[in-house]
């Protein structure tokens, strides 16, 4: 893997469901603050990181990644800020949110942005499998190509938890940031 800087942002505790979701989901009576969260990342945190460390500032050198609702948020941010985030890591993303809003967004969106995407899910995540597979098919339909700018993985028996995501972290980092010969 190529040398990189990882910046981890706390998950906001109780406000996580609001801050990590792009739309209000009336069924859950929550959500819809992802754009505000994205503004913080794009206009406060990333400039601070770029100022504080020696970074490569291009989108092709910058990723956003997350698991569960953080995966939903990361895809939304990649789609809405492709000039900032050129790589997206989606570990067990919450595709189910707001009746699969993110899949509908991709289906009706215009030109697909130039993003390199890692998408995975555990086969032990019964609730997540169907939506993640649907998202995978939509990404293919929109022009992403396996092995080039998309990697899809179903981790055998993996559950929806930090341990499972941690076990896949090296894999997704190697795909998004491969070592250059």
Task: Give residue spans per PLM region.
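Non-catalytic cap/lid and distal C-terminal segments of serine-dependent acyl enzymes
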Residues: 1-181
